[in-house]
Amino acid sequence: VAIGETADAVAAGDERCCGYLYHKIFTPVTVDQLVKDGEKFSLLGVEIEAMHLPGHSMGCTAFLFEWTGKKLVISGDVIGTLLVGDFGWDGSIDFDKKIYTESLRRFAKVDSDIMLPGHGMIYFHKPRRRVEQALNAALMQWR
């Protein structure tokens, strides 16, 4: 399951795929299911909403769903949780500060109980505060 920009990157297997950062070849693959921003799909009986949040890379997407009465968000690489003030890595080939900042603004409006990032610690307490911290750090660093 992927948004169009990610599907294009993994189908091409080009420098947008992180294997190149480690001098590895990325074997191209075809995405089974394309989704668009705001689209809902079902996986194992769970309804999941895709939220396209480009900037870190043009295909960054968060996935929102409910599980046992809790609102969860899989944020992937949209936000890092390794360090306070750290808002994620800005070194990808298609990174864009302006677009990323707008995505953080949009993501800061999402209310969830648990955030599962691509890197760092899972947030069990007010994940939106972490997103707001990241947005503030980005705004301060890039003004």
What name fits each language-model region?
Residues 1-40:
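Active-site HxH/HxHxD metal-binding segment of metal-dependent hydrolases
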Residues 5-8, 78-79, 140:
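Short, acidic/turn-prone active-site loops that include or flank metal/cofactor-
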Residues 17-22, 93, 133-135:
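Short, hinge-like loop/turn segments at secondary-structure boundaries
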Residues 30, 40, 47-128, 137-138:
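Metallo-beta-lactamase
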Residues 131-143:
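Charged, glycine-enriched surface loops/patches
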